[in-house]
Curated annotation (Swiss-Prot):
This is Putative hydro-lyase ACICU_01268. InterPro entries: D-Glu_cyclase, Putative_hydro-lyase, UPF0317. Gene3D superfamilies: PSTPO5379-like, PSTPO5379-like domain. It comes from Acinetobacter baumannii (strain ACICU). Its EC number is 4.2.1.-. The keyword Zinc-finger does not apply. Pfam families: D-Glu_cyclase.
Length: 268
């Protein structure tokens, strides 16, 4: 599929430049980088747990849309040329028995010490933000140069084998008159989380204070704006915590891998 997608050479260059910048030490959230190019989340689990996770993702496609799977010992993805998933995310989280024990900017040594890890690359809602902006909908965390707010919700994912957990959601404040357009745009892109899972009432998701996200930064919500929530690719990290997987590596929330695939490739 991917080799047949026509990409503007300038966009390809921007994506490669972003990956090289990250590889050289860039350490900030990636929303808005290489605009128009798909970004992905990541989770690496031991081979013994890989089938359970693949089934978990299959049963929960809105929060865990798998775009690529890398077998143990493979670190380059077909989603991008000259790629290395051990260096091309700005920041990684290291997990042991469901607890985060470290955060690093280069994961090569850790992958080398755990050669049995299978890696899942998962669609990211950053990939529909250019389309929102082109429709005149402000993406607040890009405008304010902050990280997107993310929350552990009370929505239970469908379990698979030994893996279970709740959905993580991301939030974007949208003016009330633009919500229908935001829904239409994002619904066309199910491979990067698709339409919102909830609009308007954080408490219905178990969120007691929208200004205190579990991951990322709080967003300004102006008069006339409504909080809109989408499924989020940090959901696998919630599953790692809940299921106490013995070892895992993930991206840090908001710190993504930038691919060579344009966002429009996922539009239905």
């Amino acid at each position: 599929m991917y080799k047949d997608i026509k990409v503007d050479p300038a966009q390809l260059e921007a994506a490669l430049d972003a990956r090289l910048k990250i590889r050289a030490g860039f350490d900030k959230p990636t929303a808005g980088m290489a605009a128009g190019m798909t970004q992905v989340n990541m989770i690496s689990v031991p081979k013994e747990w890989a089938y359970d996770f693949l089934l978990y993702a299959h049963r929960n496609p809105q929060s865990c849309p798998v775009l690529d799977v890398l077998e143990e010992g493979i670190y380059a993805t077909k989603l991008a040329a000259d790629s290395d998933i051990r260096t091309d995310f700005p920041r990684y989280r290291i997990w042991k028995d469901g607890e985060m024990v470290d955060e690093v900017t280069d994961a090569r040594e850790i992958y080398n010490a755990h050669p049995d890890l299978v890696t899942f690359l998962i669609g990211c809602s950053f990939s529909f933000e250019t389309a929102l902006q082109e429709a005149g909908i402000e993406v607040r965390h890009i405008h304010d140069d902050t990280n997107v707010p993310m929350y552990l919700s009370n929505i239970e994912c469908e379990p698979a084998g030994r893996i279970s957990g709740n959905m993580v959601v991301s939030m974007r404040p949208i003016p009330s008159h633009q919500i229908s357009e935001a829904v239409k745009i994002t619904a066309r892109m199910p491979s990067v989380h698709g339409a919102p899972v909830h609009i308007g009432h954080p408490e219905s998701l178990g969120i007691s204070d929208v200004n205190k996200p579990d991951f990322g930064d709080a967003s300004r919500i102006e008069a006339g704006e409504i909080p809109v929530f989408w499924a989020c690719g940090v959901t696998p990290q919630a599953a790692v915590m809940n299921s106490k997987i013995p070892f895992a590596i993930s991206h840090a929330p908001g710190y993504m891998f930038i691919t060579d695939i344009p966002d429009r490739a996922w539009m239905g």
